[in-house]
Regions:
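Periplasm-facing N-terminal accessory domains of Gram-negative outer-membrane beta-barrel systems
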Residues: 1-17
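N-terminal secretion/transport leader regions
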Residues: 16-25, 35-37, 304, 345
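Exposed acidic/Ser/Thr-rich ligand/metal-binding surfaces
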Residues: 4-5, 114, 118-339, 344
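Extended, small/polar residue-biased N-terminal targeting/export presequences
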Residues: 82-85, 89-135
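Short, surface-exposed loop/turn motifs at beta-strand boundaries within globular domains
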Residues: 14, 61-63, 73, 131, ...
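N-terminal plug
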Residues: 23-35, 52-58, 90-91, 108-111
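Negatively charged
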Residues: 36-89
Length: 345
């Protein structure tokens, strides 16, 4: 009814007081008890998300050209899943539809030739809202490089070890995520490790990818503590990546953080400018988010977009395996860099 629809929660509501889920989930309903005046208040929720707007339907007769970015980010899906599992309703800024679509595989036909690295999969179906219209679905599939085909990888792991990363779903989960990555590396690859908190530093100089013990030892000694000077860590990571630059390989920084940069010289525009400039030197920056309450998705998205990398969110060990193991080739090795076919445009 009309009155009933008014009582339904709107997507813009960031938190709901009660959520009842059928099946194996238990209703997240607060008991009817008086608040404890002596209770210690929890940490405030400071999660930040980029503002989103809904694209309107456009007439192709008036606007025949549509431009869109070919991104493979999937952070919004995993983060929304985390919120739902906590009994919370994701807000409209937290749900980016294209990242929900990116999360799944669609069994599109794989390109057979790396020199023609995209296949086009087109289907036509009747429109569900107008029997006189049809809908065209265009799916693009990129070329998947095998382990033997891929180039060497110069990977700098940039880990946030500030106090905000102490929770089990932050630095401890980030360490487990890195462990799932290591079996994909070999002697062609080099791994470095930079950490940042109140200050930044190198904890692992360039090390061959098959020297797993050295990499694990450097990582397992890390503990979370202190404030977050993220900008300094990023600049140091770029310096280390440049020192070990692989001309015929892929040079990438992987930032693992909750995005809560809270001390130091942190000018978002300056940081984005630095990253965009470094992008031109052939060094990619990908961002992997962890945790909640202070998760800064807005910063994460801006860094990844300016760094020509991907943005993903890790909420479980299963998701870590998907990103760093199962989709290792997809997430680490690009098949094209801002190419444009001048002869066809």
């Amino acid at each position: 009814s009309k009155d009933a629809s008014k009582s339904m929660p709107q997507m813009s509501e960031r938190r709901v007081e009660a959520v009842v889920v059928t099946g194996s989930r238990i209703a997240n309903v607060q008991p009817n008890v008086a608040p404890n005046p002596y209770a210690i208040p929890g940490e405030p929720n400071t999660e930040a998300y980029p503002h989103s707007t809904i694209n309107s339907v456009k007439s192709v007769a008036e606007q025949p050209v549509s431009t869109f970015a070919m991104e493979v980010d999937s952070a919004s899906y995993a983060n929304s899943r985390r919120l739902i599992n906590q009994g919370e309703l994701p807000g409209k800024d937290e749900v980016r539809v294209e990242e929900f679509l990116n999360y799944f595989k669609y069994q599109y036909q794989n390109p057979s030739d790396k020199n023609a690295p995209f296949s086009t999969n087109v289907t036509v179906a009747p429109s569900p809202w107008n029997k006189d219209k049809k809908i065209v679905h265009i799916g693009l599939q990129g070329y998947n490089k095998t382990q033997s085909q891929r180039p060497p990888l110069n990977l700098v792991l940039l880990l946030d070890v500030s106090g905000s990363m102490s929770a089990e779903n932050k630095l401890p989960l980030a360490k487990k995520a890195i462990r799932t990555l290591l079996p994909q590396l070999d002697s062609r690859d080099h791994v470095s490790m930079v950490v940042y908190a109140g200050a930044s530093g190198v904890v692992l100089n360039p090390t061959k990818g098959n020297e797993t013990r050295d990499i694990v030892c450097a990582m397992e000694n890390l503990q979370a503590g202190g404030s977050t000077a993220g900008g300094e860590g990023i600049e140091l990571a770029y310096k280390l990546a440049q020192q070990n630059f692989q001309k015929d390989g892929v040079n990438r920084i992987a930032l693992l953080t909750d995005g809560d940069f809270n001390v130091g010289v942190y000018d978002p525009e300056r940081l984005k400018s630095i990253i965009a400039k470094k992008r031109e030197s052939g060094i990619y920056l990908s961002v992997f988010g962890f945790g909640g309450d202070n998760y800064d998705d807005e910063t994460m998205q801006a860094l990844a977009q300016n760094g020509n990398g991907i943005a993903a969110y890790v909420d479980t060990l299963s998701e870590a395996r998907k990103i760093f193991h199962d989709d290792f080739s997809t997430n680490m090795f690009p098949i094209a860099n801002d190419e444009i076919g001048r002869a066809h445009v």
